[in-house]
Structures are given as structure tokens and as C-alpha cells.
């Protein structure tokens, strides 16, 4: 179903730059790109590019390379699931609430332009509170600066995190329910790890170590959608997650003097971070209403994206361009990664840093982060769900909540909602590259034994 568009507010098609004709398949596009996208999806067309898959797509050249045009349609946010498979006129009305909110806002802006006689670019609408300042660069106190980056690679760190060792995870051969079964429901004997936080507000056992504070979580305020408020309450504190992971990594070091290889240590950090993410999902509204099979299907689809987003948001808060902050609190300079981690991992880290800069410029806040996390979990791209309608409803509500929040709190940046969704496209691309890297390491027998991430990769392929 297409929605009308007010031509007074000039906007150009994000695919080719032609004049926008309305809302088509998830966003504002021109009539030509609407028809092209619809025909491509309904006819299941497969294109090839005779160049380097980077052809310029504009109004005059949009028909020269259908491959690059279709890829750009997907990149800017046109949705495959919005196209009807029965070839009837009109798309699937999945985005109606979002369209209506966006259209109402544009009507309001148009009225304000006429009343005040100025362009939108000169400032936020009258009566709207000024946007919050960009998040400050997060700096560790001098006493908490982690050991020199080389310590992570060449030997045990000298700081409070110096007793790292490979955690002894109770990993047995995956049973018929896959590697996630024991995390979601401990009744399955192949996994013995249970929820670290069985109640929404329960704290994990505190491990010894210095305090590690991040900005206080947002506790509420005017015009914050209820869904986002609920997600903020479910989001674990960073210092609690750090303390639990550090404790898990230190535990086996008490009984062994040798130190694990740096890459093995990073894999175990990722394992423990993912366990925290699974725990968050288990307590998440809607998710806990799904059958176990659907829960595992969703997590197997998005586990790598959730890990990437977790890392990205930590760097946005950290605020440094020449180093990264690990979940354990250690700082690692990018120059160290370049020298000792290999070219593949270095290129992956640099690509992630580009997204960090982009999100920092967009002033990504905690409210938007928890909403993006929820959107990744409830992806509409997942097939073979028993309760697809519940997942679809969760996705639509999260989209609407994020749109409402960005329009209300960042009125000076009218396309922030769309920009955030485009960042999710890059998160997915990064996650694909990360999985390829892990599988490359696995084929070279460089992955630690009983690694949960490799089990997730293998479960996805079976």
C-alpha cells in the first residue's frame, strides 16, 4: 500500500535522486525505483554487474546497471518483505504506523514553515526543546587506565586485569536442540550455563576490582515511548557485565600459570559477552513469549550482529579514535592491532571504527541503542518461525518507537531515524565479515576448543 506525500517539502529519491512520489516499500522513493524494486522482487530477478559492483546510480544512469541499482535499493532501506508475492496492486501494509507518523510530522513542519517563513535547516521547530549535546568523550580515570596494549599480546597485563586465563566453560557436544538450548532452558543437559541475572533487577556476583562507571542510564522523561523505557530497564549495566566477564576469565588462571594466546582470549571474551546477550534476550518482552524453537532461530540469525553492535556502542561511549575499549576495560591501540593481529582483523576493526565515527556524529544515545538492539533481535528476515506475526508486531512497534523518539528529541536532524537504520545495514555487513574471519580461523585450527561462536556458525549452516 502506497501513502501520499506532500510535494511542498522537496525530497529526492535516496536511490537515484529523482523526485519522490510517495512511500514505497519502507521509505520515500521515486515512482521509477518503486516499480523497479517491485518487478525485481516479484519476478525473482538476478542481475550481474559488468564493472566492479560500484556503478553510479542517478536519474540519468539508473537503468545502466540493475545489479547496482537493486543493491542501492536494499542499502538505503527498501524492504523485501513489503512487496506482495501475489502480484496484486499495493504493497503489504507493514509500515502504515510509521508512514502516518512521518507524514503527520511533515505536515506539521510545513505549517511551521508557512507560519514562520523560514527553512527547516535554520533550526528546530518553535516550542521544541533544544537537542541534547553530543555524548562526551568517555575517559578512564588515570588509576584505571588499562595496561599497555602490548601486554595484551606479549604477556600478562600488569593491572587489575592481569590474571586473565581461559575460562573453563561447560561445553559439551551440542545436542539436537543446538548450541543455545542450555542457555535458554537449562533443562537440556548439553549446556549447564543458566541465566546470570534471573530477575530483571538482580545483580550478578561482584568480582573484586576497582569501580568502573559509565554514564547513568536514562530513567525516563517526557515523550519517551513506553517500549524504550522498558528496554532501558532490561539493559544490564556495563560495569556489572564487565565484572562478571572478568571473573569468568580470571577463574581458571588461579589453577594454571600459563597464559592463553591473545586471540584465544578475545574469543573467550566474545563467548562471555554473547552469554550476557542471550541472558538479556531471555528477559526481553515478546521474546520470552515465543516458543523455544523460535527463540533459538532468532538468536542464531542475529548473534553476530548483536555482538558487533555491542562493540560499536562501547566505542561510541569510549570516544577515542586511536584505540578501542574491550569489554574487560582494557584499552588496545589500533597500531597494536595492525602489527600483531593480522591484516584481516585489522581491516575489520578499522571498518568498525568508521561506523563508530558515523554513530558518534549522529549522537547515538542509550535510548536509541537499546531500540536498535531490539530491532536486530526481531528481524523480519528470519524464515521458518512458528509465530512470525508476533515477531512482525514487535518489529513494527520498535520501528515506531524509534521514529517517535528521534523526531521528538532530535528535531534538528529530521532523517536520523533513516540514518540509524542505514547503520544497521552496515552492522550486518560487519557481522558477515566477522563470521567469515572466524570461519577462516576455524579452518586453520586456530580457534580455541569448545568455542561457542564456532558452534553458532555451524548451527546456522546445518
Swiss-Prot record:
This is Steroidogenic factor 1. Disulfide bonds: none annotated. GO terms for molecular function: chromatin binding; enzyme binding; nuclear receptor activity; phospholipid binding; RNA polymerase II cis-regulatory region sequence-specific DNA binding; transcription coregulator binding; zinc ion binding. Acetylation stimulates the transcriptional activity. Sumoylation reduces CDK7-mediated phosphorylation on Ser-203. A zinc finger (NR C4-type) spans 13-33, 49-73. Belongs to the nuclear hormone receptor family. NR5 subfamily. The gene is Nr5a1. Residues 126-139 have a biased composition (Pro residues). A 1,2-diacyl-sn-glycero-3-phosphocholine binds at residues 342, 437, 441. It comes from Mus musculus. The modification Phosphoserine is found at residue 203. The modification N6-acetyllysine is found at residues 34, 38, 72.
Amino acid at each position: 500500500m502506497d501513502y501520499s506525500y506532500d510535494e511542498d517539502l522537496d525530497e529526492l529519491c535516496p536511490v537515484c535522486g529523482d523526485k519522490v512520489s510517495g512511500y514505497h516499500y519502507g521509505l520515500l522513493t521515486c515512482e521509477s525505483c518503486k516499480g523497479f524494486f517491485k518487478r525485481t522482487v516479484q519476478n525473482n530477478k538476478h542481475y550481474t554487474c559488468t564493472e566492479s559492483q560500484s556503478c553510479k546510480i542517478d536519474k540519468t544512469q539508473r537503468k545502466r546497471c540493475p545489479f547496482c541499482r537493486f543493491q542501492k535499493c536494499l542499502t538505503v532501506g527498501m524492504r523485501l518483505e513489503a512487496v506482495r508475492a501475489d502480484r496484486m496492486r499495493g504493497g503489504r501494509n507493514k509500515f502504515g504506523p510509521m508512514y502516518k507518523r512521518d507524514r503527520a510530522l511533515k505536515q506539521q513542519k510545513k505549517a511551521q514553515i508557512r507560519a514562520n517563513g523560514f527553512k527547516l535547516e535554520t533550526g528546530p521547530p518553535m516550542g521544541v526543546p533544544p537537542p541534547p549535546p553530543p555524548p562526551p568523550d568517555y575517559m578512564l580515570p588515570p588509576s584505571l587506565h588499562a595496561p599497555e596494549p602490548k601486554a595484551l599480546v606479549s604477556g600478562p597485563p600488569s593491572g587489575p586485569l592481569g590474571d586473565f586465563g581461559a575460562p573453563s566453560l561447560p561445553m559439551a557436544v551440542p545436542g539436537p536442540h543446538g548450541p543455545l538450548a542450555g542457555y535458554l532452558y537449562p533443562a537440556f543437559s548439553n549446556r549447564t550455563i543458566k541465566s546470570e541475572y534471573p530477575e530483571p533487577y538482580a545483580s550478578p556476583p561482584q568480582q573484586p576490582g576497582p569501580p568502573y562507571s559509565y554514564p547513568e542510564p536514562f530513567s525516563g522523561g517526557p515523550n519517551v515511548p513506553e517500549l524504550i523505557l522498558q528496554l532501558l530497564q532490561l539493559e544490564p549495566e556495563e560495569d556489572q557485565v564487565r565484572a562478571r566477564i572478568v571473573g569468568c576469565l580470571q577463574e581458571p588462571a588461579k589453577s594454571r600459570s600459563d597464559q592463553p594466546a591473545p586471540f584465544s582470549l578475545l574469543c573467550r571474551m566474545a563467548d562471555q559477552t554473547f552469554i550476557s546477550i542471550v541472558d538479556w534476550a531471555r528477559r526481553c518482552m515478546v521474546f520470552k513469549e515465543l516458543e523455544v524453537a523460535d527463540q533459538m532461530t532468532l538468536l542464531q540469525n542475529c548473534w553476530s550482529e548483536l555482538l558487533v553492535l555491542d562493540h560499536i556502542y562501547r566505542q561510541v561511549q569510549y570516544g577515542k579514535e586511536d584505540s578501542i575499549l574491550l569489554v574487560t576495560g582494557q584499552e588496545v591501540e589500533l597500531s597494536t592491532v595492525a602489527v600483531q593481529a593480522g591484516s584481516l582483523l585489522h581491516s575489520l576493526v578499522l571498518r568498525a571504527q568508521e561506523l563508530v565515527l558515523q554513530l558518534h556524529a549522529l549522537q547515538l544515545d542509550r535510548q536509541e541503542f537499546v531500540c536498535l538492539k531490539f530491532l536486530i533481535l526481531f528481524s523480519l528476515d528470519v524464515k521458518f518461525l512458528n509465530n512470525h506475526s508476533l515477531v512482525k508486531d514487535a518489529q513494527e512497534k520498535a520501528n515506531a518507537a524509534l521514529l517517535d523518539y528521534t523526531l521528538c528529541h532530535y528535531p534538528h536532524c529530521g532523517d536520523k531515524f533513516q540514518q540509524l537504520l542505514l547503520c544497521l545495514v552496515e552492522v550486518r555487513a560487519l557481522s558477515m565479515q566477522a563470521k567469515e574471519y572466524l570461519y577462516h580461523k576455524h579452518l586453520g585450527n586456530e580457534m580455541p576448543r569448545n568455542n561457542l561462536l564456532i558452534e553458532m556458525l555451524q548451527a546456522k549452516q546445518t
